[in-house]
Each structure stands twice: as C-alpha cells, then as structure tokens.
Amino acid sequence: MIDPMLPLPGLSRVGGKSVVACFDGGLLSSDAGILAVREVERRLGVADRLAACLEDPRASEQIIHGLADIIRFRLLMIAAGYEDGNDATSLRRDPMFRMALDQLPSGRALCSQSTVSRLENLPDPRALLRVARAIVDLYCRSLRQVPKRIALDIDDTFDAAHGGQQFRLFNAHYYDEYGFQPIVVFDGDMRTATGGNEDHRNPTQA
C-alpha cells in the first residue's frame, strides 16, 4: 500500500531552492499538480519548440515575458482546466503557476491576459504551419521505433466563442453557436499527431 504521506521527489529547483511536494497539508491548492505537468513539459521542450516557430516583433530591450514563457503559461493553464485566456488575470499571481514558470511564490507576476491574447493573435499562416510541423516532430520523437503503419483519426472539435472574436463563424451543427472548429489528428493510441485550423464548416459539410 502506498503511503499518502510520502513526498513527491524529483522536482526541479526554483531560484536555487529545493521544491518538495507533500500530501499532508490539506487542501491548500487545487493547482499543485501543474508542478508535475511542468516536469513533463520541461522534458519534451514543448513551449521552446513552439516559440521557435514564431517571430517576436517586440523590441528585445522591452521584453519582460519571453514567448516560451507565455506559451508555457498558456499550456499549463489549459492542462489545469483553465481553457479561457481571461483566466490569466487571476492566475498570474498564483504561487503554483509562478513556481511552474521558474518564479518563487513571492516573485513577479506572470504575463497578463492581454499578453496572452496578443500571443494567440501573433502567428501568421506560415507560422501556424511551422507550429503544426513542430507538433508532428514531437509526435515522431515519441515513437520508440519506426512503426510499420500508423492509423490516424482525423476529427474536428468545437470551441464556442463568447464574444466578437476574429474569424468566428456561425455553425448550425453545434447547438447553433458561433465559434471555431479546429481539426485534430490522433493515432490509434490516442496520441496527438498534429492539429490545424478549419474552414468553419463541419467536415460533413465540406
């Protein structure tokens, strides 16, 4: 039987200080699990790979939050169930998210919602293609050996819009709502192979 009081070892140091996660402190935070997610992201280098696909138009001397850190924050938000970029406003001072972004709990705040929004509007079509290729590269690196064949499941998913976002369109197939409909590609083991933008129609309508 596993002792629930044992600490979780192997977490990376932050600001030169050791990080120890224990399970004997009660319900202190609902987002402590992102420290484990952070370790996975570090090993795969997802944020750094995606950031390398983008061109940062900002003046280097004025940059506070690098593209990789903004992407990493957004990835961790989604992993923790905060799918809306507006949640960055309340999470930018959350101690767990600060630690996941290599900041001490008392360190500076993470990027704001407006910074996240600018990031999401930054990529042009060529950058999006580079991002898709980077995801494919991550997928290929996850394979222990070259398979004889790969079965791909290509499907769409719907992301409802709750305002006047750019490029939102009405889709009668999903509850008569406005939103976005990206395409996602999985293999037979349900690993994400890649994703892409959409033409705002259901595949059955295309």
Q: What does each model-identified segment do?
A:
Residues 1-204:
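Dynamic "connector" segments at or just before major functional cores
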